Amino acid sequence: GMKESASDFHRTPFLEELASKGIRFSNARAAAPVCAPSRYSIQFGKSPARLRLIRVGMDASHIPHAEWQSIAKVLQSVDTNYVSGHFGKWGMGASPKVLGYDVGDGATRNVDGGFVNDKSQWETTLTRDPKKVFELTDRATAFLDSCASSQRPFFLQVSHYAVHSNIQTTDSSFASMNSRPLGDRHRHVGFAGMTLDLD
């Protein structure tokens, strides 16, 4: 990875390995510093300003979800054999089906991944499948296997609920991170465990 973006505590060995063997996008930008405007921008290819959606929690009823071209709709217009899937957090004003996705979890939000908007969100909970990391990965892998066996072109978007509060991690990742010295910039053992679980 890039040294200047590395954490002084969190560990992502598999992501680092993938980055070392793949393509590095060193001049990339997110459309917005928060989730909802970025998510809309990716789906519709429009800036948050053009979408008139610049913050989390803004009303999106002015956006004609069914009429606009999404990633899935564009791919299916190029090749009708394309199958599009979405797993995990959706968080948009219309369901994935409306945007042309064939397979997915529906109109999910942070709450579907274990989010509660109160002080408890920063407490660490130990669990077997934190933020549904393993369940989402298994379903995404099954989707990929299905597309490969049917030899259909595909687009898959996986939006993990991690890393996001509420803080959830496995016993083993918590123990691993708890045995390491805390960093100066990053020090939350549970959050670091959740990051390791996602990796």
What are these regions (language model features)?
Residues 1-199:
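Formylglycine-dependent sulfatase
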